[in-house]
């Protein structure tokens, strides 16, 4: 019995060794396959990362190119605004909208600094506290709506008082293009508003307001000259556009006065 047990025991050992010998190459193959799969995954991830980096670089390059194009557009107008836009008829719809947005952003930032500084002023205008996003966004949206109303006013006066077919697109392009010199003035105003020099802030605020109405009158004059038989005199056409602007300001003043009074009257 003992010999039979020894033989069976030896057979079991031999079988286990054969199984281990068979499993060993299989385990090597599985490890090799796993390494290969990991390498393939890494190789797949590399192109994705490279594509992601390339897309980010492309977007940054496109943004920088757009900034350069707008700067070239702005500098070409700054050299001689009236001649370039009014006489030569040079304007651009997309850049005109960008000019309106840039001016609105600059004025909204400077207005918030004036609103913040008004706490310590004698008359106490703007003494109610406004967070940056509140004071900034309200004025920004208000200015964008104001420019939209101005475009509508120029379109309506041109179409019904001067009998000249002017599209909204053309009116926005010319008005935004003529706004470029006002942006240059508003940058100086922003510096004085941040530094909090009330006298210079008031002077440049008045200059900005007069400049906006001046470019509106300049554009109305261009449309009037293009009209062959305008039934109404040019001066009344300008009065009509200014009246629409003042009416809009009067209607919206109760809602916006606490935000922009500090910039208009920094006392």
UniProtKB/Swiss-Prot annotation:
Q: What Gene Ontology terms describe where this protein resides (cellular component)?
A: plasma membrane
Q: Which residue ranges does the record annotate as region Disordered?
A: 1-55
Please give the superkingdom of this protein's source.
Bacteria
Q: Where in the cell is it found?
A: Cell membrane
Q: Does the keyword Electron transport apply?
A: no
Question: Which chain regions cross the lipid bilayer?
Answer: 93-115, 135-157, 173-195, 199-221, 234-256
Q: Where is the composition biased (Acidic residues)?
A: 9-24
**Which UniProt keyword terms apply here?**
Cell membrane, Membrane, Transmembrane, Transmembrane helix
What ranges does the record list as Basic residues composition bias?
A: 29-46
Indicate the secretion signal residues.
none
What membrane topology is annotated for this entry?
Multi-pass membrane protein
Q: What is this protein called?
A: Uncharacterized protein YebC
Give the organism, scientific name.
Bacillus subtilis (strain 168)
Q: What is the lineage of its organism?
A: Bacteria, Bacillati, Bacillota, Bacilli, Bacillales
What's the name of its gene?
Answer: yebC
């Amino acid at each position: 019995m003992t010999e039979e047990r020894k033989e069976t025991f030896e057979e079991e050992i031999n079988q286990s060794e054969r199984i281990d010998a068979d499993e060993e190459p299989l385990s090597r193959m599985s490890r090799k396959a796993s390494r290969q799969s990991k390498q393939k995954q890494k190789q797949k991830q590399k192109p994705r990362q490279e594509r992601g980096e390339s897309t980010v670089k492309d977007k940054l390059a496109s943004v920088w190119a757009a900034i350069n194009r707008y700067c070239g557009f702005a500098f070409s107008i700054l050299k001689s605004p009236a001649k370039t836009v009014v006489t030569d008829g040079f304007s651009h719809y997309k850049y005109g909208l960008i000019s309106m947005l840039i001016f609105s952003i600059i004025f909204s930032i400077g207005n918030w600094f004036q609103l913040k500084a008004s706490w310590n002023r004698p008359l106490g205008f703007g003494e109610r506290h406004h967070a940056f996003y509140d004071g900034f966004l309200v004025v920004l949206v208000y200015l964008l709506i104001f420019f939209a109303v101005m475009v509508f006013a120029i379109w309506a006066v041109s179409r019904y008082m001067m009998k000249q077919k002017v599209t909204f697109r053309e009116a926005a392009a010319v008005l935004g293009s003529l706004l470029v010199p006002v942006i240059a003035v508003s940058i100086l105003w922003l510096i004085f508003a941040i530094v909090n020099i009330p006298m210079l802030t008031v002077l440049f605020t008045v200059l900005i307001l007069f400049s906006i109405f001046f470019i509106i009158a300049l554009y109305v004059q261009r449309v009037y000259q293009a009209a062959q038989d305008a039934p109404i005199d040019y001066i009344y056409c300008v009065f009509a556009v200014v009246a629409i602007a003042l009416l809009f300001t009067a209607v919206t003043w109760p809602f916006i006065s606490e935000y922009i009074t500090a910039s208009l009257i920094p006392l």
